[in-house]
Amino acid sequence: AYLPVEEYGEFEYKFFFTNTVDSTYSKGKIAYVGKSGGSYTVSNATVADGGTGVEDEITNRTPVTFGGETKKDVKPDESYTSDTVTINIPEGHYLVWEWTVSGKGIPCTKMATLTSTTSSSDGTQFNYCDEIPLPQLIGAKRNVKHTLAAIGDSITQGCQTEQMKYEFWASKISTLLGSDVAFFNCGLGWARASDAVANESWLSRVSEYDTVIVAFGTNDIVSGKYEGKKSTAEEIEGYLDTIVSYLTEKGCDVILFNAPPQDFKEKNEAVRTALNEKIPAIAEKYGAKVHYGNYETLIQDEQVELIY
């Protein structure tokens, strides 16, 4: 997997994994929030310098270990973090993650054009695959003035954009904020606010950051809670209230997004409108900020000031 880095140069990295599904995918037939992963084994893992793109040679492969060992047996619902690994990623280059895992029911990340990811069942012929197990969090040891996280669905994750272009709003704001701010994108395709409420592990990861952007609503309106019906505006309001309450209790500043425009039919559009009318009251209740309008306006200078 070719992964863009936030800051170039030599840094100490750690990689976090959880063997539990963070959020419901599609209707939940294959994966749903809280589903336990199966037992699997990590045979080896490396990070490397991927050059400026997939046509470049992969160099500087560096082993990743877990408790001092290259091999790790992972149990269902286990969360774990790699040992520290130091690697230098030059300007404009990608960090490449490579590993060999064996088992069944391993939670994966649906990348969907975000980056180049390939897989092979026998290590010979590698083909494009946007459903592969990856670290849920990649962290580098850096001196920063502020930390920012975003939790939401595919609009936050960025999987609707052209492959490896990184022109979605979260990527743009990360670039605009510069090296003084560390940004963690916790968006997941198909995610609902109800998923975040049901999975404290996922929500707790973003609670460690100074400021958290909360951007849910679309999939709650379209699909609703896993094993449930489409959510009403009042139900989504309740989920968002729980999320913002949790984050503010943890000491986070919260920026709450409204539900963005979509090609909704009349009934769903009515839910979106009703939800957006309720969001300011949630923000006022907990001292959060609200971002109105489309996502592009967030990268304007006056909107970036919200983060500080």
Predicted segments with their positions:
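Conserved SGNH/GDSL esterase-like catalytic core that processes O-acyl groups on lipids
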Residues: 145-150, 155-241, 263-266, 271-273
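N-terminal Rossmann-like NAD(P) cofactor-binding module of classical short-chain dehydrogenase/reductase
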Residues: 213, 307-308
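Substrate-gating cap/lid alpha-helix
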Residues: 261-294
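Generic structural signal for well-ordered alpha-helices
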Residues: 240-244, 276, 295
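N-terminal secretory targeting modules
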Residues: 1-151, 156-157, 161-163, 249, ...
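A structured beta-alpha segment of the ubiquitous adenosine-cofactor-binding alpha/beta core
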Residues: 291-306
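A short helix->loop->beta-strand "cap" motif at the edges of active sites that frequently abuts
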Residues: 250-254, 288
